């Protein structure tokens, strides 16, 4: 959520900055004026409420004086009762006006950083850099075929039990998946990240502070039972985001770096018909996530953003998977992101780059809703500063596994990346269990 003061010119704000950001996103510009109007209405109601409270205090003092002097205060007492009724109604108006304002404010995306390519077409994503030598042979097997040839997942039984996109990892598939998780956690620990295994579900009110409204329909599974409804997490970012809810964090403690590990659950309602085979796009997967908090001052969060994408790059370099890093166009940014990089790894069988990593700087957009503040607790609302929050995939392991299979395949099986071998009991190669059909 944006700072409401950005919309208040009399408070030093500049609504034109918000309008320009909305233009870059291909989103409504008119909403800025709607918010300004709603804000003025809310503040007017607040002013009227304060006047009623002042009147109440004034009348009460007059009643006290009359009682001391023995005068008749009955008419004034009647006025206080009328004032109480008016105040109660005005409080309801204030709350209604505030709800209308913030409901609208929450639909405006974060301010798009000036370095983001402006377009609504993802074909215009800017390639920042590439790494590695791509395999270009013909007749390579794709990850769906390789999973079957190796016997490392049972998709048929998975679909029978869990429905479409269901799967069982099996044998070396389990070991390879766990190897990626353990390698990822070791990798981040060496870079001063604190590991966190997150809850797999969240309360609705907390999830609402971490996820966009559209995600509730397209991504999130609802869990019902005793007590409040809960939602399964779609990414470790969501519970990591809420970890410091309502906290004051001293600047000397920043930056904070977390390595989140979790299973994730997605309905994938918006991707119907895409990648229905294999384990690339599934409803349940494991993830190791980078999540960082920085001071809001200077370029701290932007330097951290570059550090985080470099971490992800180094991870895939150690796996020896060719990739490109792209800067995502303004029209494809989610609401929270001011800027986002994707790391897309090379899948040689389909001869295309596919996204394995998303790395976003969300500045103070999420921390405002979550009240994650920087500094010492202050009574002055205007003096509050909010931490900047950043997130980046390190590995969504089933996707990374698919990429490894395609890049490390041979005629007889699949080689295991050298950095994963210590986590595989020293195993270096997976043999095909089925013969390749010529």
Curated annotation (Swiss-Prot):
One protein family per Pfam: tRNA-synt_2b
Name recorded for this polypeptide: Serine--tRNA ligase
Top-level lineage group: Eukaryota
Record PANTHER family: SERYL-TRNA SYNTHETASE (PTHR11778)
PROSITE patterns: AA_TRNA_LIGASE_II
Family named by the database record: Belongs to the class-II aminoacyl-tRNA synthetase family. Type-1 seryl-tRNA synthetase subfamily.
Pathway in which this enzyme or protein is active: Aminoacyl-tRNA biosynthesis; selenocysteinyl-tRNA(Sec) biosynthesis; L-seryl-tRNA(Sec) from L-serine and tRNA(Sec): step 1/1
Oligomer status and interactors: Homodimer. The tRNA molecule binds across the dimer.
Signal sequence, start to end: none
EC number: 6.1.1.11
Record key words, sorted: Aminoacyl-tRNA synthetase, ATP-binding, Ligase, Nucleotide-binding, Protein biosynthesis
Biological source species: Helianthus annuus (Common sunflower)
Xref: NCBIfam families: serS
Gene Ontology molecular function: any one: ATP binding
Catalytic activity: tRNA(Ser) + L-serine + ATP = L-seryl-tRNA(Ser) + AMP + diphosphate + H(+); tRNA(Sec) + L-serine + ATP = L-seryl-tRNA(Sec) + AMP + diphosphate + H(+)
BP terms from Gene Ontology: seryl-tRNA aminoacylation
Residues the record lists as binding L-serine: 235-237, 289, 393
Function comment: Catalyzes the attachment of serine to tRNA(Ser). Is also able to aminoacylate tRNA(Sec) with serine, to form the misacylated tRNA L-seryl-tRNA(Sec), which will be further converted into selenocysteinyl-tRNA(Sec).
